[in-house]
Design a protein with these regions (language model features):
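DPxDG-like acidic metal-binding loop motif
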Residues: 99-125, 138
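Short beta-strand-to-turn element immediately C-terminal to the catalytic PLP-Schiff-base lysine
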Residues: 14, 42, 116, 139-141, ...
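ATP-binding N-lobe of GHMP and related small-molecule kinases
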Residues: 1-99, 117-119, 123, 167-170
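Short, well-structured alpha-helical segments that form the helix of a local strand-helix-strand
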Residues: 121-132, 194
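Conserved, helical-rich catalytic subdomain that frames metal- and/or nucleotide-binding sites
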Residues: 49-55, 68, 141-196
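A generic structural signal for well-ordered coil/turn residues at beta-strand boundaries
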Residues: 5-9, 35, 140-142, 159-162
Length: 196
């Protein structure tokens, strides 16, 4: 079975402040797009007591196999005793990395969704997002306006949008971009009525 892990686009993004847990309070109008990584999951034999995450494809070389959102999600699930087995996971990367398209967070959510599709709710996704990254929540809500750390609002307008994605091969790490927030103060927060 191949799992599709979709990319996202922020149609607007307001980063208002840094939170105590190191993540950032964001407001974002977003949607998923038809660009995806392909993930396959296989249970390890009992003798193996470690997950193996393999990345392939033209965007795989910059990803650490031991420190990525997939491994973080697996570690959290195992710590909470929600899974006990270990897995071999292969990811064919089609989403450019360090491009703001959420590929890493999408991969992490795809794994979470694979194991607990019917059990994921607002509380679950927010708890895990605090340890993996704020963008994880975008893939739970799929489309809408994410307002602050715990709230999402679905868009009333569900029209199809078309995009031309251009990747200039300039790496922009999310953590590095967000770290610049401390150097300025946003003039104001975005209110729901202004954008929906």
């Amino acid at each position: 079975m191949v799992i599709k892990s979709y990319a996202k686009i922020n149609l607007s993004l307001n980063v208002s402040k840094r939170l105590n847990n190191g993540l950032h309070d964001i407001q974002s109008l977003f949607c998923l797009i038809n660009l995806f990584d392909e993930i396959t999951i296989k249970k390890q034999k009992r003798a193996f007591q470690k997950d193996k995450v393999y990345f392939s494809g033209q965007f795989a070389k910059d990803i650490k196999s031991s420190d990525n959102s997939i491994q973080k999600v697996l570690n959290i699930l195992r710590k909470k005793k929600l899974i006990s087995n270990y897995y071999s996971i292969k990811v064919k990367k089609k989403i450019p990395v360090f491009a703001g398209l959420g590929g890493g967070s999408s991969n992490g959510y795809a794994i979470l969704n694979h194991f607990f599709k019917k059990e994921i709710n607002d509380k679950t996704i927010n708890t895990i997002a605090k340890h993996v990254g704020s963008d994880l929540r975008l893939f739970f809500y799929k489309k809408g306006f994410l307002n602050n750390i715990n709230r999402a609002i679905k868009l009333k307008n569900q029209d199809k949008l078309y995009f031309l994605i251009v990747f200039p091969r300039v790496k922009c790490k999310t953590a590095s971009i967000y770290s610049e927030v401390k150097k300025y103060s946003p003039k104001k927060n975005i209110f729901e009525k202004e954008i929906i």
